[in-house]
Amino acid sequence: MKGKFKICVNDSGKILAESHIFEIAENIVPDLLFLTLKSFYFQRSGVELPTDKAGKWARPKAHLDDCIEFHPSMNRKGSWNAHGGWYDAGDYGKYIVNGGVSVATLLLVAEFTEKRNADLDENSLANNSFSLSLFRENLLDEIRFELEFFLRMQDTDGGVFFKVSPIRWDGFVTPTESDEAQKRQILGKSTTSTLNFAGALAEAHRVFQNVDSTFAEQCLTAAIRAYIWALKNPDVTYPHNTEGSGGYGDERYDDEFFWARAMLFREGVKSENVLNSSLKNLRDLILVDMKKCPPSLGLDWRDTQNLGWIALALQSYDLDLQTKARNALKTVADDIVRLASEDAYHLAIRRFVWGSNGDVANHALTLFLINSWAPSLSYVNCAKTMLDFIFGKNPVDRCFVTGSAWSS
């Protein structure tokens, strides 16, 4: 039965309580896929968002960032083209470390939607108004917008600049062309930003190689150059000047090295097909990384080791590493399910902090990923319950996907 409904509790014709209006339909969740992807579109920097695509949030292009100066702390003359990319969550800075984790997550989604699309026969596609191929097309377009900004952020020596930032905090306003008067600068070149770049761009090679092979090879070449720079500069700290932007401080580099190495290994950058001596011992270093960086429940810009574990679990070059990674991640999935079963809200988090809904969503993503090679109804049900929390089944009675429900 399809339609919009409301549940009422009544006593002798008197309504004592009633639910919100809810809809039963085939394509509610797929519609949310397009809606959540659109949130990245609204974060685009340096381009116009026209009314036919952005609606009431339409705006002219601003913050072109195609000729910006270096921060004085870099002791560097000249200017740099850092056009494009996504704004951060709460300011008009553009950052590699958190942008990289976001784009890496979207690349995983792109990889799995390609597999899912291949599994669907023509009849199932014809009978479903939701187009997975159209979603993937939009997804790849959004991913590429950020990746092209990433490529512009790589210096000639292979290192990657940390962020683009205004010199002071902007007000809570929509960016306009007049904001060009607000001076913006490029800051730092760190080990974390460079390795984050390497991991994300190596993953991009896999996703884009059947879409645009030239762009895919450009991504892989850039990833290798970044990794080699990081080997020569293994502990260059993040820029500590945070005026006008977020710090995103992280002085632990093991997890980023693991992610970058695992992704390069997955892409076949091994001793037998790469001449550069810096890449000939990837497997040996990965074995060390696996001991240093066990998988965790979390996945964010500060803790990226799970992306390394996932890369090893999905690769097929080395079945021994694949088995080790899959077993380790299955333990994580079991821990998530156990913690959720002990929680009144069926969540695996134990603190509600800024961005904790992202932790909930990442737990669900982790369960769905691991379910692809270790199928378990408990993983699927737990992940669905976490999505229910995001979609409105929570103590504050609010859907956390803005613009998607009566209260969001």
Annotate each language-model stretch with its function.
Residues 1:
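Aromatic sugar-binding surface patches on proteins
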